Design a protein with these regions (language model features):
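Residues on the lipid-exposed face of transmembrane beta-strands in outer-membrane beta-barrel proteins
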Residues: 42-48, 79-85, 95-97, 125-131, ...
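Predominantly the C-terminal beta-signal and adjacent terminal strand-loop region
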Residues: 17, 131-169
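Outer-membrane beta-barrel translocator/channel fold
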Residues: 22-27, 31, 94-124, 128, ...
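Transmembrane beta-strand segments that form the barrel wall of outer-membrane beta-barrel proteins
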Residues: 18-30, 57-70, 143-145
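Short loop/turn motifs that connect adjacent beta-strands in outer-membrane beta-barrel proteins
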Residues: 11-16, 49-60, 85-91, 134, ...
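Residues that define the transmembrane beta-barrel architecture of outer-membrane proteins
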Residues: 36-42, 73-77, 119-123, 156-160
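Extracellular loop and loop/strand-boundary signature of outer-membrane beta-barrel proteins
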Residues: 30-32, 65-67, 109-113, 147-151
Length: 169
């Protein structure tokens, strides 16, 4: 998490935008078996300029963010690429990887919930609205998972909430 803080502090000079939000932590969804941990995720991060060299896949923007779990269980840092699709109303799918802080014992309330690996896939999607030229609000979903590559047990972990983003340029 310290490295994440340094990256976020150093990044805004080259970032297209910074963002932050609050998301419900470890939400139980029809696709996952969440709800083992309580609290919220406090997220802060930045997104860079579009990568023109990756134009053949839509010129995504790099991002990095840290997520602090208020319940004290599983904090994580993630990095990846995302695509902003649309105008004032937009969708932003993203693909990334995350490293989390949870102990490897994988047992909470006598239920096996291991995440399978310290490093996980971290897909995300948000739906947003550009409030002004510099400010946008997003409804965001972030999923952590090893995609059953490391074991058959893969409950994953979902966070769902709201983010605000601020364009620096």
């Amino acid at each position: 998490m310290i490295g994440m803080t340094v990256a976020v502090a150093a990044g805004p000079a080259q970032a297209q935008e910074i963002f932050g939000g609050i998301l419900a932590h470890d939400v139980d969804t029809p696709l996952t078996k969440g709800g083992f941990e309580d609290g919220a995720d406090l997220q802060v991060g930045w997104r860079g300029e579009r990568i023109d060299a990756l134009r053949f896949i839509g010129a995504p923007s790099p991002y990095v963010f840290g997520s602090l779990a208020t319940g004290g269980e599983t904090h994580f840092a993630a990095a990846g690429v995302s695509w902003r699709i649309g105008g004032r109303l937009f969708v932003r799918p993203g693909l990334g990887v995350a490293i989390h802080s949870r102990d490897d014992d994988g047992v909470i309330n006598n239920i096996r919930t291991d995440l399978g690996s310290r490093i996980l896939f971290a897909p995300e999607v948000s739906v947003g609205y550009q409030v002004s030229p510099k400010l946008a609000v997003e409804a965001a979903w972030v999923h952590l998972s090893h995609a059953q590559l490391l074991s058959r047990q893969n409950p994953g972990m979902d966070s769902i909430g709201v983010r605000l983003s601020y364009r620096l340029r």
